[in-house]
Amino acid sequence: MLLLKEENIVNGRIEYHRRKTGKLYSVKIEPEAQGIIDRYKGRQYLLNVLDEYSNYKDFISRINKALKNIGPFERKGLGGKKVRQPLFPDLSTYWARHSWATLAAELDIPKETISAGLGHEIGSDVTSIYIKFDQKKVDDANRRVIDYVFGKEKAGK
């Protein structure tokens, strides 16, 4: 995702082939995502992450370290040194996927749609050859999860 370029935006969607599998992914750009793209526009890539960090591993390492520091701190000792008490010591970038799937399940979004939204294959390899999953279901699921996070939708609908 960090290597996306402007040409990966096609008709209001981010389209790219995953390196690991070669599979084409197409994700609708919701207004909230467009706001992030606009705010963090990069020089060479869609986002400025690689303008700021030397490589993907450096970026992930720094982000995960920062996520682990979320939480209150207090000053201790004569020098007033900050002592952190992380709220979520195991928090990492992987939690975004886990959280999306959990929230989607709370909204009674079908497991098949959640699986597709995570980029997992549907059913057996043979079956998935004959089934073209309706991407609109994933688009709708993404919108519902975003609305739920912002308090615009209630669980159990």
Give, region by region, the residue ranges found by the protein language model.
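Short, polar N-cap/turn motifs at the start of nucleic acid-interacting alpha helices
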Residues: 7-13, 90, 109-131, 152-157
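C-terminal catalytic core of Y-nucleophile DNA break-rejoin enzymes
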Residues: 19-69
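C-terminal secondary-structure termini that scaffold catalytic or DNA-interacting sites
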Residues: 44, 50-54, 81, 137-157
